Amino acid sequence: MPIAFEDVAPVVPVRDLQAALERYRRLGFEVRAYGHGTGYGYAQRGTVSIHLSEWDEHDPKRTGAVVYLYVSDADAVRAEWASCGVEGRLGEIRNTDYGMREFGFVDSDGTLHRVGSKLP
């Protein structure tokens, strides 16, 4: 029987775990820290999970991460994120040549979140 890969969870570096958990909470994720003082936490929305790892040496200008979030309605997510007041760079939404409607959001830790839904 072939081995099945069942899920993936990116681990992104953050400078301050508590600040990152609050940011993801404001973006609509359920968040929690793992243990006390471990510098590790989770942000989950639906079946999507992003792991957060506090890293003292993290420099958003030199190290970063990219996650692609497949969603049912990228326009609705962009509108939601635009209204939540989270610090970062929110890009315009656009249709791509590869059949997605997507936008990008770079948070204060330098993580690029590309968010897209399939074009009809």
Question: For each predicted feature, which ranges?
Answer:
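Short beta->alpha transition motifs characteristic of CBS
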Residues: 11-13, 54, 97, 104, ...
